[in-house]
A protein has these predicted regions:
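Protruding loop/beta-arch "assembly-hinge" segments enriched in small, turn-prone residues
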Residues: 1-28, 245-248, 259-335
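Short, cationic low-complexity segments
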Residues: 76-82, 212-225, 302-323
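Extended serine/threonine-enriched, polar tracts that run as long, contiguous segments within proteins
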Residues: 191-197, 205, 212-280, 284-285
Length: 335
């Protein structure tokens, strides 16, 4: 039996659909409800341009209402319903893999499914990292510009032994949620480094629930779905590591995937391998990942798309919603 070649199984339309389905299924922030697709962003991502605006209505306020009376000369003055915008930035991304990279998958019983699964996993991880670095950017902006009113930081870089007061705990997580005041009931998921997750497990604060729809087992902390990701910030100081845990509400991050001219293609180089030939699979995406309540200012972006480092830069973010209306908070601990 001859070996399957990537050209034998590659169909651009089928591949694009299967790869997108795989990345959605494998993205922990999508499956937890933290990130949701916004049809407006998907449409905007397909029309071209790197920067766009997402309009929103400002809250009506909480001022005391008028009191009705029977005086014909008394009239009420209507308040204005005002709008504002959140600016976002599109990320045009691509990557490629050679036949040698995919050789193991080509030998499997379902090579097409194996390859699209691997590429889908790659893009799921890439989008998760864009989400995480965006939240690190709004954390940095919050500390720099808004007095850190979204973060509780109990970590230190002291040379002494770490105390319980500097470690994650039930009280510390509740304190972080309290930064949202009476809006804290909107929190639905908590993302943490595996070191923090392990400590909560040792305290027997993590439960496991099986999804009735797809029989998937997932972790919960109280009423919060748990996402464990070691790409969350773990900054080593002179003496200690500071871990950042992020608590989200449902749909606190919106996303959109635009249509690229050629989402994927296969290129054949017959001269490679001293004439043996090599096939290269290219995958391209146009994505928007945007935390609600903030605008991306692009004040410190060098290229057409923001890199992960630029997403985490405080100067590139500005809060445009009131703190209580943003279902995101942060907890920084030494473990």
């Amino acid at each position: 039996m001859s070996q399957v070649q990537i050209a034998d199984i590659y169909n651009p339309l089928v591949f694009a659909g299967a790869e997108q389905e795989a990345q959605i299924e494998l993205n922990a922030f999508l499956s937890s409800g933290v990130m949701v697709e916004d049809p407006r962003l998907t449409a905007m991502a397909s029309v071209g341009g790197n920067i766009g605006e997402l309009p929103f209505f400002k809250p009506l306020g909480t001022e005391e209402p008028n009191y009705s009376n029977d005086v014909t000369g008394d009239t009420s003055t209507p308040n204005k319903i005002t709008t504002a915008i959140m600016r976002y930035r599109l990320a045009s991304q691509n990557n490629s893999w050679s036949t040698m990279d995919l050789a193991a998958d080509l030998a499997l019983q379902d090579p097409a499914g194996a390859i699209t699964g691997r590429v889908g996993q790659y893009w799921a991880t890439a989008l998760e990292r864009r989400l995480i670095q965006s939240t690190m950017g709004i954390l940095a902006s919050n500390v720099a510009n808004d007095g850190g009113d979204m973060v509780v930081n109990i970590a230190t870089d002291a040379s002494s032994t770490i105390t319980d007061a500097e470690l994650v705990s039930n009280d510390a997580i509740l304190d972080a949620q309290q930064t949202a005041g009476d809006h804290q009931s909107g929190f639905s998921a908590i993302a943490m480094h595996s070191v923090v997750y392990s400590r909560l497990r040792k305290q027997q604060l993590i439960d496991f629930v099986r999804d009735a729809d797809n029989n998937t087992l997932f972790s919960t902390y109280g009423n919060l779905r748990v996402v464990v990701d070691d790409s969350l910030s773990a900054v080593a100081g002179s003496n200690r590591v500071t871990y950042t845990t992020v608590i989200f509400g449902n749909g606190s991050v919106v996303s959109g995937m635009g249509r690229t001219t050629t989402p994927s293609e296969l290129d054949r180089d017959p001269e490679k391998g001293n004439g043996g030939g090599q096939s290269t699979l290219y995958s391209r995406r146009a994505d928007i990942v945007h935390p609600l309540g903030f605008q991306f200012t692009s004040d410190s972006v060098a290229g057409q798309s923001a890199t992960l480092a630029e997403l985490s830069t405080a100067a590139n973010w500005e809060r445009v919603w009131e703190r209580k209306n943003i279902p995101i908070c942060f907890l920084q601990t030494n473990g």
